[in-house]
Amino acid sequence: MISLTPSLFLNKTVVPGCSTRLSLRQPRTIITPPASLRVFSSLGSNQDPTGSVLIETTATSSSSLETSAADIVPKSTVSGGVQDVYGEDAATEDMPITPWSLSVASGYTLLRDPHHNKGLAFSHRERDAHYLRGLLPPTVISQDLQVKKIMHTLRQYQVPLQKYMAMMDLQETNERLFYKLLIDHVEELLPVIYTPTVGEACQKYGSIFLRPQGLFISLKEKGKIHEVLRNWPEKNIQVIVVTDGERILGLGDLGCQGMGIPVGKLSLYTALGGVRPSACLPVTIDVGTNNEKLLNDEFYIGLRQRRATGEEYSELMHEFMTAVKQNYGEKVVIQFEDFANHNAFDLLAKYGTTHLVFNDDIQGTASVVLAGLIAALRFVGGSLSDHRFLFLGAGEAGTGIAELIALEISKKSHIPLEEARKNIWLVDSKGLIVSSRKESIQHFKKPWAHDHEPIRELVDAVKAIKPTVLIGTSGVGQTFTQDVVETMAKLNEKPIILSLSNPTSQSECTAEEAYTWSQGRAIFASGSPFAPVEYEGKTFVPGQANNAYIFPGFGLGLIMSGTIRVHDDMLLAASEALAEELMEEHYEKGMIYPPFRNIRKISARIAAKVAAKAYELGLATRLPQPKELEQCAESSMYSPSYRSYR
């Protein structure tokens, strides 16, 4: 597997100065909330003397400024306009002005600040102190009751996309309540926030787009990406999830509308891994799209051009990666998400030695699948080296999983990696990958080209290779046909079948099909969720090989240890930590993944194992090493509970 070597620098960006020329008379003293004084909209560049700025100063006392229209000197101006008695520029529409506002986060403004808003949970004392009287109904309710109320509302919706939109709206109005809701009801809401619903949300992103989430960097920003990153209001970024939208789940090229993926992933970093929301930055790199339907869609929000490739693409990505390091330092995690195969492998290889990069499609998927296979050994016995693996799909996920399995076999059995690969076979769109095809296949497939006669059909490959484990990463639905599953069941007492493609419509087979066609003997897991299946009086609970088991805890482990490079051994440590979470009660139901309801505890344990491995390898920079890493992970997690305001 590709060994990653990341490095980033953490430096603090200086906020440019504000040039709005306001002359104020003697200020009056009033009580202010513990929020911030906001002057203006976005961050301007250092070269712009009249650049628009956002200034935030935390209130340390109970005094602030209050002015009336009469307090403003009539001739003071903003960006050259002629100011009237009300402090507004009396300019024509043709005269450029600087749009600005002066507000304190209290009262009406406080209710519309998602970071501080508590809705009806503001106490009577807080309502008096922060000018909220009359702006809210008189009742005061707890955060728990708010959660109960919203869950009641969400359950009235019949369409998953409606639930998704309601959750995104909540995130933009009351951040802490959003995360409280997601943490408390993670098993029910995870399919809403992420797969499979996020796939439909990305497909319809232009139609449902209301307000921007994340940072959009297009070819139009080439040469200015450093300044664009400074427009983001938060400066202490710890995790970036970035996509170029070319391979969104199993849905293909969705261009700029792939932003739903970074937003969703980072929501899970916070809810499941405890990374602060303010430390997360979703980014979409827009280089166009080859999706004709989107190019002709009047609601499409991205560049209306064919996708840039080659040098133009590489230069934009290199500028982005360089700017990230300059702005946020060398210890920020950069997670590549849903890039096309060729770019995914190239970016990982190119920046693995200079940045702290992680590809969830290659490495996260591999780690969670390996965890499931380790757990499945409880049912089938033996070690991984005793099994034979056949993959349908030889892209990022397929080759990434195959390489991590081979690495685990190599380490546990003390055999060369090349020898460990011989029990792993891959099938792509042209059939079984064999030595005779070596000259015509992509470089990342070549390690899996073994000596064998060519085979075109999957069912024939199953009969010839006789695998004990069948893994689907093809992105093509219904490819594990009845013939394929029945053949696996004839060859094995307990065939392991993993149908990993997302979303549900692209799954190689359903849970019901796997259990029925194998007479209830299959050990099954999927990429998208399936309901429990009853077969001949026994209830089977299909596992979901969801990357959300791994990447939140993995990222937290990197952050808490100050790791400067991702190493393959960290992925193995994460897999083993997840497999250890299975209890006897889970095995009795045929499960190879633990329930999601304990995901924060699981993430803390994964983080501890990843951090421990980083310290062992000498890649951690946060010294000295904490004695209790799991306790350290738990204590560093973000809490969504409301805070009391003075």
UniProtKB/Swiss-Prot annotation:
EC number(s) per entry: 1.1.1.40
Q: Does the keyword Nucleotide-binding apply?
A: no
Q: Which residues bind NADP(+)?
A: 247, 361, 390-406, 502
Q: List the residues marked with site Important for activity.
A: D361
Q: How is the cofactor bound?
A: Divalent metal cations. Prefers magnesium or manganese.
Could you say which cofactors this protein requires? Mg(2+); Mn(2+)
Provide the alphabetized UniProt keywords.
Chloroplast, Metal-binding, NADP, Oxidoreductase, Plastid, Transit peptide
> Where expressed (tissues)?
Expressed in leaves, stems, flowers and roots, mainly in vascular system. In roots, present in the stele, including the vascular tissue and the pericycle, mainly at emerging lateral roots and at root tips.
Subcellular location(s): the record lists: Plastid, Chloroplast
Show the GO cellular component annotation of the record. Answer: chloroplast; mitochondrion
Q: In which pathway does it act?
A: Photosynthesis; C3 acid pathway
Q: Which SMART domains match?
A: malic, Malic_M
- List the active-site residues: Y194 (proton donor), K265 (proton acceptor)
Which coarse location class describes where this protein primarily resides?
plastid
Q: Where does a divalent metal cation bind?
A: E337, D338, D361
* Transit peptide, residues from-to: 1-74
| Similarity comment text for this entry | Belongs to the malic enzymes family.
What role is this protein assigned? Answer: The chloroplastic ME isoform decarboxylates malate shuttled from neighboring mesophyll cells. The CO(2) released is then refixed by ribulose-bisphosphate carboxylase. This pathway eliminates the photorespiratory loss of CO(2) that occurs in most plants.
Note the subunit structure.
Homodimer and homotetramer.
Q: What is this protein called?
A: NADP-dependent malic enzyme 4, chloroplastic
| Organism whose genome encodes this protein | Arabidopsis thaliana
Q: Name the gene for this chain.
A: NADP-ME4
